[in-house]
Amino acid sequence: MYQGHMQLVNEQQESRPLLSPSIDDFLCETKSEAIAKPVTSNTAVLTTGLDLLDLSEPVSQPQTKAKKSEPSSKSSSLKKKADGSDLISADAEQRAQALRGPETSSLDLDIQTQLEKWDDVKFHGDRTSKGHLMAERKSCSSRTGSKELLWSAEHRSQPELSTGKSALNSESASELELVAPAQARLTKEHRWGSALLSRNHSLEEEFERAKAAVESDTEFWDKMQAEWEEMARRNWISENQEAQNQVTVSASEKGYYFHTENPFKDWPGAFEEGLKRLKEGDLPVTILFMEAAILQDPGDAEAWQFLGITQAENENEQAAIVALQRCLELQPNNLKALMALAVSYTNTSHQQDACEALKNWIKQNPKYKYLVKNKKGSPGLTRRMSKSPVDSSVLEGVKELYLEAAHQNGDMIDPDLQTGLGVLFHLSGEFNRAIDAFNAALTVRPEDYSLWNRLGATLANGDRSEEAVEAYTRALEIQPGFIRSRYNLGISCINLGAYREAVSNFLTALSLQRKSRNQQQVPHPAISGNIWAALRIALSLMDQPELFQAANLGDLDVLLRAFNLDP
C-alpha cells in the first residue's frame, strides 16, 4: 500500500509539472492494494476496488462444449450410430445458442472462423437410395441459414463411406427428430430478428425524412440567422450606451467570479492596500482588495495582473488564468502577466497555450522581439486552452528563441529569460536543465519566493524530493503565507513517507485561508479543494479513520486539535 501511494503522488507531480501537482489528476488514479473506503463525493480517490472490475463477458458453457466437439468430429469418422447423433445435436445446440444470447465480437468471430474452415465441404450421398434423406438435410440447412458440419466423400475411405451410409439409413428418424426442434426454434428467432430489422429500417427512414425536411427549410434557418444577428447588434448598442459610471463586464470578466459580499468594495485606495497585504502574505484579503480595485476601475490592468498572480499563489489556478487573460486584453505587452500566464497554463496541462504565452513574451519584450522577426515561417499557435501535448517542432522553435536570446546576453543573466527557459525545459521533460535555469535566475533574485517554489517543484518532478523540501522551506521563510508552497511541501512530505508532516502542512494552509477570511468577517470562506483532497490522502496513509471522517466533513477544528495546531 505504501508503494502504491508513493507512485500515485509521483505520477501526480509529473502531470502538473511546474508550480504544484493537481490533486484532481491522481484522484482518478488508484492502486489495487489500497483499502476501499465508503463512497462519498469527496472520497473518490480511495474507492480503489472498482478499478479492478473485469467487464469482459464470459463464454457460456454450452458453446464451449460445442466448440470443443468440432475439432474432435473433424478427426473421427462416422463409425458408430451415436457419433452421427451427437454431431447433429451439438451443431443444433450451437446454432440455437448463437441466436439466443448476445456475445462479444471476438466470440462471434471465433465461431465464424471454425465454420469457414468447412465452407466448401459438401456431403455427396447416394442420390438413388438416399436422395430423399439428403434433400431433407439440404432443405433444413437452407431454412436455418447456417452451415452444416458435413464430411466430404473425398476425405474418407470407401469402408468409412459404407459405414456412414448404414448409420445414416438406420438413424434417419432420430436425426430428423433432433433437427426439427432446433429448426423450429431457429425459425422463430429468424422471425423476431426480421421484425426488429424491419422496425429499425423504418425508424431510419423516418429520421432521414425528418432530417431532410429540416435541412430543406431554408426560410426557417434564414429567419433564425437574422434574429441572432439582430440580437447581437442590440446587445452591442446597449453596452456602448451604458452610463460612464456603470461597470461594464467583458467576456473574460464574466468568467471570473467576484465575491458578492466584499467588505472592501468601496474602500478608497483598494489597490495600494492590496499590495500592502500581499507583502504581508495575506493572500485571501489581498484578493478581496484587488477585486474591489477592479470593481472601482474595470480597466485597471495592473490590478488584474496582481489579482491573477495572487490567485495562483492561493492555489486557485483557473481564477488566475481568467484574471491574467483580462490583464493582457487591456495591456498586451505586460511581460509579468505573460510569464505568470505561461506558468499557470503549464500547471493546468495546457502546453500549447503555455508555449504561445512564452513566445508572446519574446515578441513583446523590447530586448528580444527582433529575434522573432528574424524567424520567418515559424509555426504559429492558434489553439486555445488545449490539453493535447505540445507539438515538438513548436516547442523546439520557442526554446530556440530563448536559447538564442540567452546567448546574445553573454555573461549577463536575465532572470525573467531564465525563468522562461526553466518553464520550456519543464515542458520538454528536461528537469535537470530546468533546475539549472531556475538556479541561474536565483543568483540574481535570491529573495524571490516564487522562484524558490518553482525550483522546488522542478526538483520534486525530477525525483529529488529531499532537495525540493529545502527549496519549499526557503520559499516559506521568505513568504510564510505562501499557501501554494505550503501545499507543495506537503506533497513532497508524502513522497518521502513523512505523512504526519504532510498533514501538518496541509492543515496549516487551510488554517491560513480560513483565519484570514474570518478576521474580515467574510462569509463562505473559499478554501482550496485541492488541499482538502491531499489531506484526505495523507490521513488515509496514516490509517486514521476517525480523522479521515473529519476531513470528509470539512471539520477543520477537530483536525487542528488532533495535531496540536493553533486554530
From Swiss-Prot:
Task: Quote the cellular component terms of the Gene Ontology held in the record.
Answer: cytoplasm; dendrite; membrane; receptor complex
Q: Which PROSITE patterns match?
A: TPR, TPR_REGION
| Database matches in Pfam families | TPR_16, TPR_8
Outline the TPR repeats, range by range.
Answer: 267-300, 301-334, 336-368, 415-448, 450-482, 484-516
Which keywords appear in this protein's UniProt record, sorted alphabetically?
Cytoplasm, Membrane, Phosphoprotein, Repeat, TPR repeat
**Keyword Lipid metabolism among UniProt keywords:** no
Where's it found, cell-wise? Cytoplasm; Membrane
How is this protein positioned relative to the membrane? Peripheral membrane protein
Gene3D superfamilies, sorted: Tetratricopeptide repeat domain
A GO biological-process term = maintenance of protein location
Residue segments, region Disordered = 56-105, 150-169
Q: Give the domain of life.
A: Eukaryota
Annotated positions of the Phosphoserine modification: S146, S194, S198, S202, S386, S388
Membership in a protein family: Belongs to the peroxisomal targeting signal receptor family.
Described function: Accessory subunit of hyperpolarization-activated cyclic nucleotide-gated (HCN) channels, regulating their cell-surface expression and cyclic nucleotide dependence.
Q: How does it assemble?
A: Interacts with RAB8B. Forms an obligate 4:4 complex with HCN2. Interacts with HCN3. Interacts with HCN4 with a 4:4 HCN4:PEX5L stoichiometry; reduces the effects of cAMP on the voltage-dependence and rate of activation of HCN4.
**Protein name listed in UniProt:** PEX5-related protein
Q: Which organism is it from?
A: Mus musculus (Mouse)
